[in-house]
């Protein structure tokens, strides 16, 4: 009787371990190089912009029901289509999902329908560590005169980020959104976290947790696991944006996680074309498709004229920052946080392609974009 009891104990203990491990066993695995490259071979060369409708100051104003502006979205995506763009990088927000998950997912579906009419497949961003660390639902404040991206908010905010007891909220959001659209061919990819360890040194540094990097090192792998548990047919990524990428050994710890967890690689580069190409070549050592999900800062040396031909040569996806100069005011340089452009405008636009009426900032630029994309 004692032997039988012990056997039963071992059986139940083994079953318990299996049940605990089951979610991980059932979760989708990291894509192999072959799968990632096979997927990319079937895609047209991705070229587009980071998109926020000109009537929104941030992600919350874009997606909340009261300010969701389909007319502007349709009009501005039409301008993007007209110059050959076929993707947009679009930021979501966990607070909007928590407020009304079904309503938010319906608005995402509406956005996807509009984008599809313009032959655009977006990359959706779930979390973002840049700018204001205290997002609040409701009416958003007006743009601060003369200041670049004066209303953009982080997702999640500091209050959630530094409290692990609230992480189940983030897990529900990731699994909810990715799960709802896991099989949607209108979506190109999921960018799980934008610049995760950005400390916002020149803007909101005092509002960020002092141990932000440590927090993100523990949280980002969980976010990848949550997204994989939803079994998306689209690839997952999180973009490298600083550090030495010569090898995994020289990379910051967070960058290693991004490389090792991403199905396709992505990165940001706002520097000269020589630097852009150098970073492309460094990432090619990992033998996976590459997207540049942020570039084009004219005053810093990153331009359509010089970067797009390099991206096309290496078949690296190219997604510049900014489409239409609107409430985000990203045509203003980063240094506007120290010196607002109130009484004068910058000598050259920092980001963005179109004026509010659809007129290109530089006609030659849109001709270059159209020329490069027409030769896909």
Language-model segments: residues:
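Active-site mouth of glycoside hydrolases
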Residues: 29-262, 268, 273-274, 286, ...
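Short, surface-exposed amphipathic charged segments that create phosphate/polyanion-binding patches used
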Residues: 333-337
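Carbohydrate-binding surfaces of carbohydrate-active enzymes
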Residues: 363-376
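The feature captures the conserved acid-bearing segment of alpha/beta-hydrolase catalytic domains
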Residues: 276-284
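Bacterial N-terminal signal peptides
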Residues: 11-24
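Bacterial N-terminal signal peptides that target proteins for export
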Residues: 2-13
């Amino acid at each position: 009787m004692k032997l039988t009891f012990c056997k039963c104990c071992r059986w139940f203990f083994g079953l318990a371990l299996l049940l605990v491990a089951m979610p991980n066993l059932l979760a989708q695995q990291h894509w192999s190089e072959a799968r990632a490259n096979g997927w990319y071979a079937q895609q047209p060369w991705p070229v587009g912009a980071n998109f926020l409708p000109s009537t929104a100051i941030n992600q919350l104003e874009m997606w909340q029901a009261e300010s969701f502006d389909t007319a502007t979205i349709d009009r501005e995506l039409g301008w993007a289509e007209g110059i050959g763009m076929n993707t947009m990088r679009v930021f979501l927000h966990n607070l909007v999902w928590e407020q009304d998950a079904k309503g938010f997912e319906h608005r995402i579906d509406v956005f996807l329908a509009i984008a599809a009419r313009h032959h655009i497949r977006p990359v959706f961003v779930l979390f973002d560590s840049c700018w204001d660390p205290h997002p609040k639902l409701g009416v958003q404040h007006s743009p601060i005169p003369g200041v670049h991206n004066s209303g953009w908010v982080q997702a999640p905010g500091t209050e959630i980020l530094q409290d692990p007891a609230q992480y189940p909220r983030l897990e529900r959001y990731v699994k909810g959104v990715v799960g709802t659209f896991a099989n949607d061919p209108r979506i190109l990819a999921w960018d799980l976290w934008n610049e995760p360890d950005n400390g916002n040194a020149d803007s909101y540094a005092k509002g960020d947790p002092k141990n932000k990097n440590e927090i993100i090192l523990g949280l980002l792998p969980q976010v990848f696991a949550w997204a994989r548990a939803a079994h998306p047919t689209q690839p997952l990524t999180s973009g490298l944006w600083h550090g030495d990428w010569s090898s995994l050994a020289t990379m910051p710890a967070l960058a290693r996680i991004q490389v090792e967890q991403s199905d396709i690689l992505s990165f940001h580069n706002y520097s000269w074309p020589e630097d852009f190409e150098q970073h492309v070549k460094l990432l090619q050592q990992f033998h996976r498709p590459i997207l540049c999900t942020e570039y084009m800062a004219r005053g810093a040396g990153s331009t359509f004229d010089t970067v797009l031909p390099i991206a096309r040569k290496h078949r690296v996806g190219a997604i510049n920052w900014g489409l239409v100069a609107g409430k985000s005011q990203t045509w203003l340089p980063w240094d506007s946080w120290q010196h607002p452009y109130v009484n004068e405008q910058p000598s050259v636009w920092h980001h963005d392609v179109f004026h509010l009426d659809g007129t290109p900032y530089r006609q030659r630029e849109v001709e270059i974009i159209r020329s490069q994309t027409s030769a896909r």
